[in-house]
Amino acid sequence: MVPTMHGRSQPPHLVLALFALAAGISLPAAAEEPAPVVVELYTSQGCSSCPPADALFGEIVRQPGVVALGFHVDYWNYIGWHDPFSSKKFTYRQKQYAMSFRQTGVYTPQIVVQGKRGEVGSDRAAVMAAIADAKKAKPMATVAIEKLGGDRLRAVVRAGSEAKGADIWLALFDRRHTTKILRGENEGKTLTNVHVVREWRKLGRFEGEKAEFDLVAANEKGDKRAGVAVVVQQPMAGPILGAGVAYVE
């Protein structure tokens, strides 16, 4: 029977801690919650190779400890279907990764993990291994996002001197979109895309021990978005140092 105090049963871990304290035994520290790992999917509704990667990404977004961001590129728009979520900004970001990884060019589908490793987006084994490896690393920056009410939030970034000069990015994304494809390589298919990034912009650079930003989960036109992510990253699409995510819808 578990010992009681004031007539209430005490949790076994508390009893163990009290026993250890009385006996002078030190217990191992509680495991820290792993820092979020940023997983970016570069995809297009006009790419016939992308649906399997989109499906894998749909599984990844449900993983704990993952900040999943779906970037739709624009370089497949010319073959018949204009991806409504595509942006030149997202293509440019992928091109920066291509230079960082010393690739000869860009391709879809591609998944980039923590800004350090790029894999074919439909290669489940390689992608999952990259995520598992990234989760083992200690973050160099932490991001806490507090909901203030409605679509207003506040992000607080904390880091040491090693993060000085890092870029701080804001992503606004929608949880899910289902689209009937009328032309192009995926003509006749109905595609589902999740964590679709709608806006990507720089908030500033990290210059000290702490940085705060008041955010609105909407674009300049007032279109609201379901999710907000803040990413701390070395310049020119370098390694990601830390990230945080929050949902308003």
Predicted region positions:
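Short, low-complexity polar/charged micro-motifs in intrinsically disordered terminal tails
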Residues: 28-29, 245
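Short, conserved sequence motifs used for protein processing/export or organelle targeting and
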Residues: 84-110, 116-249
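Glycine/alanine-rich phosphate-binding loops at beta-alpha junctions
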Residues: 6, 22, 30-32
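Bacterial N-terminal signal peptides that target proteins for export
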Residues: 2-16
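Bacterial N-terminal signal peptides
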Residues: 13-25
